[in-house]
């Protein structure tokens, strides 16, 4: 269908607004989204004119263009629902936009989505895309002056060995994660002392940052992603500053070093570089690996229990995988995986959203560190909930600290770069399964960027003072 025939049944106002549409795909979906918006804006005097002014003069100041907030915050387009500001930012600015986590409201916006007011601003130029943070290089000393007697390893590692429970502790989202407003009072989780260097929110306070729904893509959109669940909690929007870094690219990943660092001869800077595949995912049944590793090149990945004959590179379909040793428990569990989990990587952060009707269970040391939980804690994510499971910036800070404490301290961080996740069945102190290898269906996620960064840092550090082994 060409553009002329497509527009033959559209109103002049919709035609005009579609003239500013970005991207070439899903013309019909964009038309329906704009048509739904026009019907709402016609009820407000001057709203259409203000939107056209914003779209035609993107560099000029413009007023909020609002529509009423629905009960669940979502807008239905083509029988599916999405968050309104995401839908129209996708239509008019960023066709590849996947989630509301990628957007921040500008200071000039009076009705940002996150403010929970009765009206929502959908002016695409009142939002800015979240940029991946530029991670500072790790400075590795060229000459080792490390004194083993002054090692922090006893504090860094021994607590893990001394307080390691017979099986992992458990936490449930959102019950175990206090949902506090921004600038809330500090909290101390009821879990054993973290074995990592003091976490940012262990005794210093934390704000829950897990909205009920991270995704706002849907099968009616250009991305063929699932329907957006309603957001149950979102922190207030933080004002955007005008000096944010531009979207991450390979040039920004190795930024120009300050003169005082570049002139130093006693350190070797090791910069973070974004890999071609941000993660690999391996599927297991009990303690048996099944199938080949899935390499994630897209920032948005679905891991589900279905089959996909089209071999979509954004989907890892576990239903395709066969295993001659599969028992009835595994078969039954696989039937309940359903829509599975949505993993996505944005702004240097990894999120997991449970799309399955059954809960998923996640063991992420980075997430546990952030919340002050014991490193091996297993977090339950119920259906239609999401959780941030890795933060590049916090990992960078830990790595920079650990370099000064020796090879072993840096090597210990490799455990943080692997995330384990089980479907339907959990494990840990509250379950009869003690280990993830006892769960019927689970995946292991390897984060390539952090792992490769660690490898480069360890290479610069040379050999360890104590041999690294499987029991070290």
Curated annotation (Swiss-Prot):
GO biological process: anatomical structure morphogenesis; BMP signaling pathway; cell differentiation; dorsal/ventral pattern formation; embryonic pattern specification; myeloid cell development; negative regulation of DNA-templated transcription; regulation of DNA-templated transcription
Residue intervals of the MH1 domain: 12-136
Residues of the signal peptide: none
Record localization: Cytoplasm; Nucleus
Residue ranges constituting the MH2 domain according to the UniProt record: 278-472
Segments of this protein annotated with the region Disordered: 158-238
Keywords (A to Z) from UniProt: Cytoplasm, Developmental protein, DNA-binding, Metal-binding, Nucleus, Transcription, Transcription regulation, Zinc
GO molecular function terms listed in the Swiss-Prot or TrEMBL record: DNA-binding transcription factor activity; DNA-binding transcription factor activity, RNA polymerase II-specific; I-SMAD binding; metal ion binding; RNA polymerase II cis-regulatory region sequence-specific DNA binding; transcription cis-regulatory region binding
Biased composition (Polar residues): 169-182
Record PROSITE patterns: MH1, MH2
Domain of life the protein comes from: Eukaryota
Xref: Pfam families: MH1, MH2
GO cellular component: cytoplasm; heteromeric SMAD protein complex
Coiled coil regions in record: none
Biased composition (Low complexity): 188-226
Composition bias, Pro residues: 227-238
Binding site for Zn(2+): 64, 109, 121, 126
Record bears the keyword Transcription regulation: yes
Gene3D superfamilies xref list: 2.60.200.10, SMAD MH1 domain
Summary of subunit composition and partner proteins: May form trimers with another Smad1 and the co-Smad Smad4.
Physiological role: Involved in ventralization. May mediate Bmp2b signaling during embryonic dorsal-ventral pattern formation, and may itself be a transcriptional target for Smad5-mediated Bmp2b signaling.
Family: Belongs to the dwarfin/SMAD family.
Name of the protein in question: Mothers against decapentaplegic homolog 1
């Amino acid at each position: 269908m060409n553009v002329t025939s497509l527009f033959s049944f559209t109103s002049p106002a919709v035609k005009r607004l579609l003239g500013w549409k970005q991207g070439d795909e899903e013309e019909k979906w964009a038309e329906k989204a704009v048509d739904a918006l026009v019907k709402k804006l016609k009820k407000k005097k001057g709203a259409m004119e203000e939107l056209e002014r914003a779209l035609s003069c993107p560099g000029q100041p413009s007023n909020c263009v609002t529509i009423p907030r629905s009960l669940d915050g979502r807008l239905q387009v083509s029988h599916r629902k999405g968050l309104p500001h995401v839908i129209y930012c996708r239509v008019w600015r960023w066709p590849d936009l996947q989630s509301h986590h990628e957007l921040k409201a500008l200071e000039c916006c009076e009705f940002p989505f996150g403010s929970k007011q009765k009206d929502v601003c959908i002016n695409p130029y009142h939002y800015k895309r979240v940029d991946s943070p530029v991670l500072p290089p790790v400075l590795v000393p060229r000459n080792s002056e490390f004194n083993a007697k002054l090692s922090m390893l006893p504090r860094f590692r021994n607590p893990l060995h001394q307080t390691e429970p017979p099986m992992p502790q458990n936490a449930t989202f959102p019950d175990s994660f206090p949902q506090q407003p921004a600038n809330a009072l500090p909290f101390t989780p009821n879990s054993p002392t973290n074995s990592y260097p003091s976490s940012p929110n262990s005794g210093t306070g934390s704000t829950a940052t897990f909205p009920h729904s991270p995704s706002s893509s849907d099968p009616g959109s250009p991305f063929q992603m699932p329907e957006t669940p309603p957001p149950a909690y979102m922190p207030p929007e933080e004002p955007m500053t005008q000096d944010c870094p531009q979207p991450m690219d390979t040039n920004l990943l190795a930024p120009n070093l300050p003169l005082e660092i570049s002139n130093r001869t006693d350190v070797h800077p090791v910069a973070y570089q974004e890999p071609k595949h941000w993660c690999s995912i391996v599927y297991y049944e009990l303690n048996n690996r099944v199938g080949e590793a899935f390499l994630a090149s897209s920032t948005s990945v679905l891991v589900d229990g279905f089959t996909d004959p089209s071999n979509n590179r954004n989907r890892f379909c576990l239903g395709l995988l066969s295993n001659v040793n599969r028992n009835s428990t595994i078969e039954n569990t696989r039937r309940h995986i359903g829509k599975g989990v949505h993993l996505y990587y944005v702004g240097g952060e990894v999120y997991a959203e449970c799309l399955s009707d059954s809960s998923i269970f996640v063991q992420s040391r980075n997430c546990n560190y952030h919340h002050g939980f014991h490193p091996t804690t297993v977090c339950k994510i119920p259906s239609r909930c999401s959780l941030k499971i890795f933060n590049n910036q916090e990992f960078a800070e830990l790595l920079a600290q650990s370099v000064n404490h020796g090879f072993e301290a840096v090597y210990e961080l490799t455990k943080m770069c692997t995330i384990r996740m089980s479907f339907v069945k959990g494990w840990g102190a509250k379950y009869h399964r003690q280990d993830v290898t006892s769960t019927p269906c689970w995946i292991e996620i390897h984060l390539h960027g952090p792992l490769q960064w660690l490898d480069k840092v360890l290479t610069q550090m040379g050999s360890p003072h104590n041999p690294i082994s499987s029991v070290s």
